[in-house]
From Swiss-Prot:
The record marks 1284 as: Arginine finger. Rho GTPase-activating protein (GAP). Binds several acidic phospholipids which inhibits the Rho GAP activity to promote the Rac GAP activity. This binding is inhibited by phosphorylation by PRKCA. Involved in cell differentiation as well as cell adhesion and migration, plays an important role in retinal tissue morphogenesis, neural tube fusion, midline fusion of the cerebral hemispheres and mammary gland branching morphogenesis. Transduces signals from p21-ras to the nucleus, acting via the ras GTPase-activating protein (GAP). It comes from Rattus norvegicus (Rat). This is Rho GTPase-activating protein 35. Residues 1124-1141 have a biased composition (Polar residues).
Length: 1499
């Protein structure tokens, strides 16, 4: 119903007549009062439809047309409006005017002949078919406009708008207008229709006229006035709506807004529309080449465009568009101008950089000069049309050359003047820099390390400050400081080399004591080169420590002359001389699978490693071969993307030994993964023999697949990568360039670069060199070492040329890159000589460890350091080895003119005389010396060959029978880290056997060598004593293959096997490895030896052996012989300085004197020998305040628990030696609490308590042990050396502390290493008050183990096992079961049941060694634990007895050893390893020796 009512309501319609002054020009003036404009704006308010010109002068035809229709009024049409009360209405608008004839200029005659005043007041208007009026142009062209007739041809007027023009009209008097209006109003009032006064043209209004109009309105009753402006569209609608409100009384009264307030609102509306339109134009129009037609079409539908066109019209919109286009063009030209002006100084610098050429030229002349330059057209372009900014050149974006007519502008002239001034200033600044640098070089106050603040006052003046900033001088000063500091460091390094004897005499290790560092500073303190670094004490100390590291760990990399180390030069010379290897080397290369193999780890998360591996494989051949420098290599890739601590992601495996690692990243997260993985990998190998992963060559690569080398993120990643590469000391490769190819992470050039670097590193580590066989070494008659000094001013090529160019020179069989073979006639026979050419620092390690028949030592006569190194080297050479000194000079003239050369030549000659060596000098200017020069020396070597070899054999066997600790204290005695350019021990790659020989095939050659050696000795009467003495040593010592054990006497007829093994061990040590190869890192021969139990080097006392001691403590203690001289250099093996010797105590030399060192024969050698006896070997940690106390105790005689009491000489020697080794104070030592890593900082309620307190009947296994074993079995069963390699002590302590606080600790979450967890588990058992295997049970276990029958023995052990306390039995069963599972993975982890038993028996049993029986039972303890691990199913799970591996009847391990000593019979058996010394005569085990050996092999 409501809807129907609304539809029935009819829209009201009002007819309004607009009237005002009209007539001829005489009455209204030159223009009308604006009635037509008012009607036009109201009916058609759009700016484009608004017309200002509406003429009233018409022709007769126009007046008679259908629009005017012979009437003096116009029908404007119908308008629909919504008034203020939102009610819509319709209005018909009529304008009463008076049309003038264009001929007579008098009003046209119409049907109504009344005057205008009466005609205008008419309320009934009729005109048939009268059309709606638009504008003057419509007249006569009605068909071109919309034709809409006045409704019904008649209208009834409802109200009047009475217009008054308040502008200053031409030829019109305002007072006359008011009179006309007054008369018109009176006539209108008669109609009783509403009237509203409309003031038109208020935008041009006169204030007086407006005021008079308002006064007129006030004189009339209820006459309202509306101020309007049709042109500005102000209050037009208000005038009509006000009239409608008067017509319809029911409507609300309209508020009349003053003109200026309405104008302000209208202006704001227009301004807003304009802003929006301009924004639209700027968004759409970007180029100054756009045109209005296309842009207006684009904007047609935009409301911003529509609103502005409605208010201001299309023409104004177009005008704004053209202004925007002009602005764009201007901005474009200015940008181009700035670019040209910015490039102009660069053009000046390129074309006229010389001030002398243009110093006095004007800009015009300089312009002509520019045209003559060859590169003129590269910088400038000459245009046909000018100026350039009005030509099409502005749109030629590809041509960036400068328009030459720009030079005519003022800015270009200014830039030219600026260029001249810049050149002049640069010349002056260069002069100032040069003068400042001269001041620095001549000033005596500028010393290395002096801060700028201190130096400034000495060298600065006002002129310097005037021309340059202080930062420039600081930069020059910094560079100068760097130069003089580098020079001072080089000189200081030379000083350190000149004092080489001091460093070697002090026997420095990796961590020198404060006392030794003090001695170094005291000795060097008065040297000017030492004082030169006074202000750089930290760097000076660092250089000293670096030099100490070089002395202790001499390699090509640590060599002060690196990369010009002699070893590298020699390798290059020898390798280039023998390009084509011998047949034997070819055969070895073919048989060695790693000779041409590169193992590469690729590390990168999120698929980076896998993708790069695929890309590299795509560059390889079908069989994964890669060509480098024309040679094909086998490439083995191992991509890793996960946790490197997991076995599946380990860097190395038993079958994969990495030679290098590519580290990939493409984000901060992947870079963090690389850093964490490298650190974890390095941590996991610390303390292991195969810790070469710490020095694994790394290459860090930023993967940038698209080759994009821009962007802040990429630059940030590059900077971070460079920082990490510097931290890791590895190579950093920039991202691949864009031209590599789509989808590539790295290009082939970079891959080749990486692989070449790996090959170089691999060669340096000698990973590709083959090991010399014993047969190869046996073929050599003499082994000579030629020593050269790194950094000497001579060419190694000149020295080696006579050797390498000799027809007798051949490649070395052993594959060494430093050795050659010579066949020279010496005497009546030809001798095969192996000549090894090494640097001095490489030669130090072989003086005692390798068989050398003679040394040829070179030194430069004009370099002090060269002779000093020679002296240091000769100090530790035995006096039986011939020496050839060779001095290198610059010629006879230089020797005469140079005092230093003369002095050093004289000193070298005197040294040669004192040591009975040979001396010669060779001028460096001499093209080549001749090899015959050394023939007298070679004859000396041949004469002394037998005694040298006999002495070397003696020393090696004696060393094998003494403590292993003595070998590792001094760098002279074979530095443990001395591996310069020589082959590393291969034993780090594969687990060493527990037998003395792994390959039986080498035994026959050994026996032949023994026979040969015997016959040589028999023919030499002068060596009878040495041979007898040598055999005596063998009869009294057994070489310990695992760790030092007590020396024991036994008869040859009973224990030939042990003797033969001892002799062969000495042979193997001296001959089986490559000649001249230094010892590797600390490498106990027994792989299963726990690293945390390896005895560290001791000071002052000689360690006889180390055994687990004190059952209540579980510590590793050392029994020492304090009779050994304390100041013998500890590890150098020199017997000459010993008052007595553990090897030769009680014997007297009767025939031949024992060899001594050259230091004792030459007064010029060992000038710092006094410091040698002043300090014990050790670091600060070992040389604490206890040293004084120990010295006092040693000087007071034989005191203390471990002192060895001397016995009478008539006592049985075997008994005396045993008791010397094992004699302890009869007073039993007081039990001491076991030092625990977990008790250091807190009291634990879990560790170190009785086992019964941490288990319950429901949980018989300690939860800590359960967690550790679960973690190890989940992640570590494949870890190489598990339980052998100790974990980090601090991590083990942290693990126990955290577990003590939280028994629910998740080991996997904490990311502990497997070795840390394994070590913590062993520590748990070590800290128990009583061992897991009770003491009472240990005696029974040993008795059961003595049973010969294997099956009976196992059942007896099982019966003893049943007597264990329940808690101990359950935990023991759990641990042994775990170890059994570990041993099943021995192919991967290399831990057999035997290895595991060696690691675990001291932890599980902790025997007391206060008695001889307990000591000799150590082998039994280990074997018992091994049986428990092997036969775990039988002992704990009622399974049948399993057969041991490798015990088949007739196998070598099941046969008794029968090899006689020093015979040529080939050895065919392989005896059980002597893990402990053989039983003594006092031991109850002696009668069972043979049967026990047989039984143990059977087991």
């Amino acid at each position: 119903m409501m809807m129907a009512r609304k539809q029935d309501v009819r829209i009201p319609t009002y007819n309004i007549s607009v009237v005002g002054l009209s007539g001829t020009e005489k009455e209204k003036g030159q223009c009308g009062i604006g009635k037509s404009c008012l009607c036009n704006r109201f009916v058609r308010p759009s700016a484009d439809e608004f017309h200002l010109d509406h003429t009233s002068v018409l022709s007769t035809s126009d007046f008679g047309g259908r629009v005017v229709n012979n009437d003096h009024f116009l029908y404007w049409g119908e308008v629909s409006r919504s008034l203020e009360d939102c009610v819509e209405c319709k209005m018909h608008i009529v304008e009463q005017t008076e049309f003038i004839d264009d001929q007579t200029f008098q009003p046209h005659r119409s049907t109504a002949l009344q005057p205008y005043i009466k005609r205008a007041a008419a309320t009934k208007l009729a005109s048939a078919e009268k059309l709606m009026y638009f504008c003057t142009d419509q007249l006569g062209l009605e068909q071109d406009f919309e034709q809409k007739q006045m409704p019904d041809g008649k209208l009834l007027v409802d109200g009047f708008l009475l217009g008054i023009d308040v502008s200053r009209g031409m030829n019109r008097n305002f007072d006359d207008q008011l009179k006309f209006v007054s008369n018109l109003y009176n006539q209108l009032a008669k109609t009783k229709k509403p009237i509203v006064i409309v003031l038109t043209k208020c935008d041009e209004g006169v204030e007086r006229y407006i005021r008079d109009a308002h006064t007129f309105a006030l004189s009339k009753k209820n006459l309202q006035v509306v101020e309007t402006s049709a042109r500005s569209n102000v209050n037009v609608d208000l005038a009509f709506s006000t009239l409608v409100q008067l017509i319809d009384k029911s409507r609300g009264k309209t508020k009349i807004i003053p003109y200026f307030e309405a104008l302000k609102q209208q202006s704001q509306q227009i301004a807003t529309a304009k802003d929006k339109y301009e924004w639209l134009v700027s968004r759409i129009v970007k180029s100054h080449n756009e045109n209005w037609l296309s842009v207006s079409r684009k904007m047609q539908a935009s409301p911003e465009y529509q609103d502005y066109v409605y208010l201001e019209g299309t023409q104004k919109a177009k005008k704004l568009f053209l202004q925007h286009i002009h602005r764009l063009k201007h901005e474009h030209i200015e940008r181009r101008r700035k670019l040209y002006l910015a490039a102009l100084p660069l053009a000046f610098e390129a074309l006229i950089p010389n001030l002398d050429e243009v110093d006095h030229l004007s800009c015009i002349k300089a312009k002509k000069l520019l045209e003559t330059k060859p590169e003129f057209l590269k910088w400038f372009v000459v245009l046909e049309e000018t100026p350039w900014d009005e030509t099409s050149h502005i749109d030629n974006m590809e041509n960036e050359r400068i328009p030459f007519d720009l030079m005519d502008t003022v800015p270009a002239e200014q830039l030219y003047e600026t260029h001249l001034e810049k050149l002049r200033n640069e010349r002056k600044r260069a002069e100032m820099r040069r003068a400042f640098k001269e001041n620095l070089e001549t000033s005596p106050f500028i010393t290395p390390g002096k801060p700028w603040e201190e130096a400034r006052s000495f060298i600065m003046n006002e002129d310097f400050y005037q021309w340059l900033e202080e930062s420039v001088y600081m930069d020059i000063y910094g560079k100068h400081q760097k130069q003089i500091i580098d020079r001072a460091k080089e000189e200081f390094q030379e000083l350190l080399l000149e004092y080489s004897e001091l460093f070697y005499e002090l026997e420095l290790d990796a961590k020198p004591s404060k006392e030794k560092m003090g001695v170094i500073q005291d000795v060097l303190g008065e040297e000017q080169r030492f004082k030169a670094l006074q202000k750089l004490q930290a760097e000076r100390d660092a250089l000293i420590l670096k030099h100490i590291h070089f002395v202790y760990h001499p390699t090509k990399e640590t060599c002060p002359s690196c990369p010009a180390c002699v070893d590298a030069k020699i390798e290059h010379l020898i390798s280039s001389r023998f390009i084509r290897p011998s047949d034997r080397n070819q055969k070895n290369s073919l048989s060695d699978p790693n000779i041409d193999r590169i193992n590469l780890v690729i590390l990168g998360k999120d698929g980076l490693a896998r993708e790069l591996a695929n890309e590299i494989r795509a560059l390889c051949t079908n069989d994964d071969k890669y060509v480098i420098d024309g040679k094909m290599y086998e490439l083995s890739l191992r991509p890793i993307e996960g946790n490197v601590r997991l076995p599946v992601n380990s860097f190395q495996t038993p079958t994969f030994q990495p030679h290098g690692c590519l580290c990939l990243y493409n984000s901060k997260e992947s870079l963090s993964y690389v850093v964490e993985s490298i650190e974890k990998s390095r941590e996991s190998t610390l303390g292991r023999r195969d810790n070469h992963l710490v020095h694994l060559p790394l290459t860090l690569i930023l993967v940038n697949k698209r080759g994009d080398t821009s962007g802040e993120t990429l630059h940030s990643l590059i900077q971070q990568g460079q920082q990490i590469a510097s931290k890791l000391q590895c190579v950093f490769l920039d991202p691949a360039s864009a031209g590599i190819g789509y989808g590539r992470n790295i290009n082939e050039k970079q891959i080749s670069q990486v692989l070449k670097g790996l090959l170089d590193s691999k060669r340096n580590l000698n990973l590709v060199s083959s090991t010399a066989s014993i047969k190869d070494l046996a073929d050599v008659d003499l082994r000579i070492v030629m020593c050269l000094m790194c950094g000497d001013p001579f060419s190694a090529d000149d020295i080696l040329s006579p050797v390498l160019q000799s027809q007798t020179c051949k490649s070395s069989h052993c594959g060494s890159s430093n050795s050659v073979l010579l066949e020279l006639p010496i005497g009546v026979h030809k001798k095969r000589i192996e000549l090894s050419v090494l640097s001095y620092h490489s030669s130090f390690s072989i003086r005692k460890s390798r068989l050398v028949h003679g040394y040829i030592v070179f030194y430069s006569a004009k370099r002090k350091a060269s002779l000093a190194m020679l002296r240091a080297f000769l100090c530790e050479v035995q006096d039986i080895i011939p020496i050839q000194l060779v001095a290198l000079t610059d010629g006879a003239i230089d020797v005469l003119d140079n005092d230093l050369s003369r002095e050093q030549l004289t000193e070298g000659e005197e040294i040669a005389q004192e040591i009975d060596g040979r001396f010669t000098s060779i001028p460096c200017s001499q093209p080549q010396h001749k090899l015959e020069l050394f023939h007298p020396f070679f004859k000396d070597v041949v004469e002394k060959k037998n005694i040298i070899e006999a002495t070397h054999m003696y020393d090696n066997v004696a060393e094998a029978c003494s403590t292993t600790e003595e070998v590792f204290n001094s760098p002279r005695a074979g530095s443990p880290l001395c591996n310069s350019n020589l082959q590393d021990s291969e034993e780090d790659v594969e687990p060493p056997s527990y037998h003395l020989f792994r390959e039986d095939a080498t035994l026959p050659s050994l026996s032949k060598d023994h026979s040969k050696f015997s016959m040589e000795l028999e023919g030499n009467d002068g060596l009878s004593f040495i041979m007898s003495n040598f055999e005596s040593k063998l009869n009294n010592k057994v070489p310990p293959p695992v760790k030092p054990k007590p020396p024991v006497h036994f008869e040859i007829t009973k224990d030939l096997s042990y003797l033969d093994q001892g002799h062969r061990e000495g042979q193997r040590k001296s001959m089986s490895s490559s000649p001249w190869m230094p010892q590797d890192g600390f490498d106990p021969s027994d792989y299963a030896e726990p690293m945390d139990a390896v005895v560290k080097p001791r000071n002052e006392e000689e360690n006889i052996y180390s055994v687990p001691h004190d059952s209540t403590q579980g510590k590793i203690i050392t029994i020492r012989n304090i009779n050994k001289a304390q100041s013998n250099g500890s590890g150098n093996g020199s017997d000459s300085e010993m008052d007595t010797s553990s090897l030769e105590r009680g014997r007297k030399v009767s025939a031949v004197s024992k060899p001594v060192l050259y230091r004792t024969r030459c007064t010029r050698l060992g000038r710092f020998a006094s410091y040698r006896t002043s300090f014990s070997v050790g670091s600060d940690d070992e040389l604490g305040p206890i040293r004084k106390k120990e010295e006092d105790q040693a000087s007071q005689g034989y005191k203390g628990d471990n002192a060895v009491i001397p016995y009478e000489t008539d006592e049985d020697p075997r008994r005396r030696n045993i008791l010397r080794s094992l004699r302890r104070n009869t007073k039993k030592p007081k039990p001491k609490p076991r030092p625990s890593i977990t008790k250091a900082t807190w009291e634990s309620n879990y560790f170190g308590v009785p086992l019964t307190t941490v288990v319950t009947p429901e949980k018989p296994i300690p939860i800590f042990i359960e967690r550790c074993i679960e973690y190890i079995e989940a992640t570590g069963l494949s870890t190489e050396g598990i339980y052998r390699v100790s974990g980090n002590k601090s991590e083990m302590e942290s693990l126990q502390r955290q577990f003590d606080q939280d028994h629910n600790l998740d080991l996997a979450e904490k990311d502990f290493t497997v070795n840390t967890v394994a070590g913590a588990m062993k520590s748990f058992f070590s800290e128990l008050p009583d061992p897991l295997v009770p003491y009472s049970m240990q005696i029974d276990l040993v008795e059961a183990h003595k049973i010969n029958d294997r099956e009976q023995k196992l059942h007896a052990l099982k019966e003893v096992l049943k007597k264990f306390p329940k808690e101990n039995h359950e935990v023991f069963k759990y641990v042994i079961s775990h170890l059994n599972r570990v041993s099943h993975n021995n192919k991967v982890n290399l831990m057999t049941s035997e290895n595991l038993s060696i690691c675990f028996w001291p932890t599980l049993m902790r025997p007391d060694f206060s008695s001889m029986d307990a000591l000799t039972a150590t082998r039994s303890y280990q074997t018992i634990i091994e049986l428990f691990i092997q036969q775990c199913p039988f002992f704990f799970y009622n399974r049948p007895i399993s057969e041991p591996p490798g015990a088949a009847p007739g196998s070598p391990s099941a046969m008794a050893p029968t090899v006689p000593f020093l015979t040529s019979t080939p050895a065919t058996s392989q005896p059980s390893p002597p893990q402990s010394p053989p039983p003594t005569p006092q031991s109850p085990m002696q009668p069972l020796l043979s049967s026990q050996l047989q039984a143990e092999h059977t087991l």
